[in-house]
Structures are given as C-alpha cells and as structure tokens.
Amino acid sequence: MEKKNIILNLIGLRCPEPIMVIRKTLRKMKKNEKILVLADDPSTKRDIPYFCYFMEHQLLDRFIHVKPYRYLLKKG
C-alpha cells in the first residue's frame, strides 16, 4: 500500500494557528507517516520543534534560512 505525501501550506497564518492546524492534521494521520509543513511565521521556528518534542513526533528536518520555512515531520 502506497503512503500519500502530505504538504501543509500554512503561509500567511500567524501564531497559534500553524500549530493548531498541524495538530489537527497529525491526528488524522497514521504512525510514521510524514508531512511537509510550509510556513512563514517566525514563531514556527520555536513552536514546531517544541510541539514535536512534547507531542512525541519527530522533526526530521527543517529549512529556516529563507521563507517559506519548511519542516519535515514524522508522526510518532
């Protein structure tokens, strides 16, 4: 069974909306599925790593040098 790739475009959303949308999306996903998050809110550089840590998801990679910021998450 092929896994689908999920890209979540959160450009234009401001805190706390990006985390709320990520959480809602991850709840619908299965364990070990991956999601690519695109965001431009500077607070995501702090919020997404903490969110992953506390919710026991993995932050596999992040690209935060230029906008849009990109985060690759794996559901825990």
Swiss-Prot record:
**Compartments in which it is found:** Cytoplasm
The protein's matches in InterPro entries, at most eight in alphabetical order, are given as: Sulphur_carrier_TusA, TusA-like, TusA-like_sf
Stored PROSITE patterns: UPF0033
Q: Where are the transmembrane segments?
A: none
The record's Gene Ontology cellular component field reads: cytoplasm
Q: Which GO terms describe its biological process?
A: tRNA wobble position uridine thiolation
Q: Which Gene3D superfamilies match?
A: TusA-like domain (3.30.110.40)
Name the pathway: tRNA modification
Please name the GO terms that the record assigns under molecular function. Answer: sulfur carrier activity
Decide whether keyword Transcription is in the record. Answer: no
Which NCBIfam families has this protein been placed in? PRK00299.1
The record's HAMAP family line, in alphabetical order, gives: Thiourid_synth_A (MF_00413)
Q: What does this protein do?
A: Sulfur carrier protein involved in sulfur trafficking in the cell. Part of a sulfur-relay system required for 2-thiolation during synthesis of 2-thiouridine of the modified wobble base 5-methylaminomethyl-2-thiouridine (mnm(5)s(2)U) in tRNA. Interacts with IscS and stimulates its cysteine desulfurase activity. Accepts an activated sulfur from IscS, which is then transferred to TusD, and thus determines the direction of sulfur flow from IscS to 2-thiouridine formation. Also appears to be involved in sulfur transfer for the biosynthesis of molybdopterin.
Family in the record: Belongs to the sulfur carrier protein TusA family.
Name of the protein this chain belongs to: Sulfur carrier protein TusA
Gene for this chain = tusA
